[in-house]
Structures are given as structure tokens and as C-alpha cells.
Amino acid sequence: MLHTIKPVANARKTTKRLGRGPGSGTGKTSGKGHKGQLARSGKTLRPGFEGGQIPFFQRIPKRGFHNFAQKKYAVLNLTTLQNFPEDSVITPQLLLEKKIIKDPLSGIKVLGQGTLTKKLVVKASKFSRQAEASILAVGGKIEVI
């Protein structure tokens, strides 16, 4: 039974035998052509190499710049604020202690994802309109620091 099992047709591709005479179709130069860089051993050309000519990616002009004065804010959503007890004061120091944010970056921005049902005092650098409305609607306070 086991000795009769064969793989599905064309499932196992036979390897191309190189340099085995002119009758094989890949004799003599083994499909590498005559001389030149690509015929040598260890032929590895990096992607985009154009034979010494200035490559396309270097010919096109550079665009844009990196703004070093850009401010990045740590994001805090209402779903996270919902986990705090009622009437608690949420500050960047508290968020760092509880490991809710790893790095305050340029400050903290509170976003409006989720719902808030608890009255809280939130101190942060920025608030989205939706987050601000949600905190105030429940009777909480907002302080921009």
C-alpha cells in the first residue's frame, strides 16, 4: 500500500541540471551567456542597479522635509478615563505612574473614543471637541496645562 503512493502530477519540480553537455540544453555556459558580470561567480546585484549608470531613484529630485519642531502627543481615549473612580483628578503624572502612557512626549491629547459616565477632573495639553463635550456633559472639568 505505502509503496504505491506517488506525488500529485507536477507537484515536485525536477531541478535543472546545468553543465551536462550540449544535448541537455543547459551545457557549456549553463544558461549564463558569455562572459560579463552576470556570468561570473558570486553574481549579486542590488535591486535598482543599472550597470554603473546613475540609477533612476537617484535621478529623480528629493521632495519634502522632516519637521523637527513637530509636536507629538500621547493619546488618551475616554474608554481609558472610564476606568478611573468617580471625582478623581487625572494628571499626566498619574497616567505615568499607572503606566497608562509610556512617554508624555509634547503633552497629552484626550480623544473622544468611547463613552464617559463618571464625573472627572482631567488635566491635559489638548482635548478633541467630542472629548471635551463628553467630559463636560457628565459634569466633569477640563484643565489645559
UniProtKB/Swiss-Prot annotation:
* Record-linked Gene3D superfamilies: 3.100.10.10
UniProt-listed Pfam families: Ribosomal_L27A (PF00828)
Keyword RNA-binding present in the record's keywords: the answer is yes
Concerning InterPro entries, the annotation shows:
Ribosomal_uL15, Ribosomal_uL15/eL18, Ribosomal_uL15/eL18_sf, Ribosomal_uL15_bac-type, Ribosomal_uL15_CS
Q: Which GO terms describe its molecular function?
A: rRNA binding; structural constituent of ribosome
**Could you tell me which residues belong to the region Disordered?**
1-50
Q: Name its GO BP terms in alphabetical order.
A: translation
Query: What keywords does the record list, in alphabetical order?
Result: Ribonucleoprotein, Ribosomal protein, RNA-binding, rRNA-binding
Give a GO cellular-component term: cytosolic large ribosomal subunit
Q: Does the keyword DNA repair apply?
A: no
Biased composition of type Gly residues is found at 20-30
List the HAMAP family hit by this protein, alphabetically. Ribosomal_uL15
Per the entry, what this protein does is:
Binds to the 23S rRNA.
Task: Indicate the family of this protein.
Answer: Belongs to the universal ribosomal protein uL15 family.
Q: How does it assemble?
A: Part of the 50S ribosomal subunit.
The UniProt entry, under PANTHER family, shows:
50S RIBOSOMAL PROTEIN L15 (PTHR12934), LARGE RIBOSOMAL SUBUNIT PROTEIN UL15M (PTHR12934:SF11)
Q: What is this protein called?
A: Large ribosomal subunit protein uL15
Species this chain originates from: Phytoplasma australiense
